[in-house]
Amino acid sequence: MSKLPGNKLAEETSPYLQQHAQNPVEWYPWGEQALTLAREQNKPILLSIGYSACHWCHVMAHESFEDASIAAVMNQHFINIKVDREERPDIDQIYQTAHSMMSQRSGGWPLTVFLTPQQTPYFTGTYFPKTARYQLPGFAELLPRVAAYFHERKDELATQSVQLAEALARTIPVANHLVSANENTIRLAFDQLEANFDYTHGGFGTAPKFPNPADITLLLHQAHDGNKPAEEMALQTLSAMAAGGIYDQIGGGFCRYSVDERWNIPHFEKMLYDNGQLLSLYADGYQLSRNKEEKAVYAQVVAETIAWMQREMLSAQGAIHSSLDADSLDVHGHSEEGAFYVWQPAEVKALLSPAEFVVASRCFGFDRAPNFESQAWHAYMAVMPEVQDQLLLQSAKAKLLEAQGLRTRPGLDDKILTSWNALAAKGLARAGIVFERSDWVVLAQKTVDFIREYLWVKNAAGNFQLMATAKGEKVHLNAYLDDHAFLLDTLITLLQASYRSVDMQFAEEIAEALLGNFEAESGGFYFTSHQHEQLIHRAKQPYDNATPSGNGIATVALQRLGHILGEARYLQSAERSLQAFDNVIKKNPAGCASLTYALQEYLNPPTLVILRGEAAKLTSWRIALKNYYPHHIFIYLDESADKLPGTLRRNLLSNVNGWICKGVVCSKAITDIPSLLTQL
């Protein structure tokens, strides 16, 4: 089918936008062409925000955007703009916040926003059915009413625009002139998490259940500091997710969230950002746990999740694709959520030996009532396998995975996002450190090398700048705060896995970009750079969501790099960030867990441990330092380490030497492992 006239999406990098390129709707990507057209024609804008793995986005597209009669109304009354929220999180953040303010409801996707030509929203919603149902108005009847409101209520819209601008401005926290949050604030964070903890099933709140990686990270850190309840909460949650259906028991990797409180039935989309963060968490949990069976489960989760990434998500260039769709074709050729992942017992029985079927049925719940829409079975760990059954279960999983591979696969969103690749690379690096897997570290390095080679580009002024996304030969969109913050954090982790001078240089360049392009005068960092296009609001977000707060991670990473290099400017910038968000952290430290951890390292700076020696001799030191040390930075410098900054420069001697540094003071050289462990 040829491209429809007026639809401008076919050349976009986003698979989500490309999915709508053949709609009868005259879609435009967000940009000056569409915005100018709205102003010139005095038409309202219909802004539709979603992403390719979103189930309800597909439903609304099929019901409304593929319908010629609906499209005709949209084209008559509106300038229609389609946005991929993964490529344009800046736009998504603004209008999700506006939707929450205007409707007093939480947002989500698809997000449907009607804007004035000046980009101010005047009516918002999420999914709208074609005809009225679910207590929602029908899209067909809604469109002309919303268009008429724009033309007939100009005075009301002007007043509403001013009120919204003022409300958005109030979301920027008022900075303090000092950091008054303290150890009591960190204890309050635990109290807030504990109050919302599900002691029966792990995790926080009720259904739907999300992994909340930033919360678990904070609990793991507090567990290391002797908080036993925090340890129990973190490990119970990790174990419950590993046993649940939110984790793909057959193919590895985690789905976005669980629709039930027991973690058993997921929303089936698989997102890179979840899996990258969870790799780090399960590696940390493995180090912290003292339970042999628990450690074995965490190790298996890490290995299987990385295998899934390599098998289904890795690009030929070494970067990692974004997501897998929740929907796929079932045996009848119908697009259904979860079709790729669910089973029928008869199908399983035909694929396995009798002994394998008995074990798999018992362990994965195939011998129980159907748990997915009352007609299919989704595997979860109903019963842990006995020791003698583990090999049978592994062989059953291998056969089921092979059979699953013959099904129609979920759609792959194959764009490369800098921020998500950074999260994945950190997870790979942490796993490589913990499990002594140099091949996983190499995967992390290749991911970062891709970012440095393809997404770190010279601009018109001849300066390097980071870009947000790539697909094929096209690299575009100025990178956001999260891209820079997550990448800097990842580079610091990689330096601990295997020191490379190119990574240290890149870390310094990204840190300078953060300070030069994102820092606010009052402290903290804007989500968009100083060179970014002007939108109706410039966000400065302290709170963690599915991904951690860019402000929190930037603050942690700048502090850590500042201590490694002895660079006061980085430490001062981090302090200004904590001052900027001081009131927010004191009021809701659990809601901004990443900033709370930054506060913890501000109050008690991390210990830098420098180890210099030949690679072969450093191995025993690495093994001895395998415990969980979240407040330490370990830098191993073998004979290949070159171009060292002054703070790390040490002579290479015949035996390994170590130094423990706090602030600007380092210990005398330590020449044996027991002495080092004693001083830690």
Regions found by a protein language model. Give the residues of each.
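Extended, hydrophobic alpha-helical segments in both membrane/secreted and soluble proteins
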Residues: 50-57, 254, 275-278, 428, ...
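Replace the tail clause
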Residues: 1-427, 431-434, 578-680
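Long, polar/charge-rich, low-hydrophobicity segments
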Residues: 291, 311-316, 458-485, 490-646
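Glycine-rich, acidic and aromatic/proline-enriched surface loops and short helix-turn segments
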Residues: 240-247, 446-457
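Tandem alpha-helical RNA-recognition repeat domains
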Residues: 220, 224, 283, 287, ...
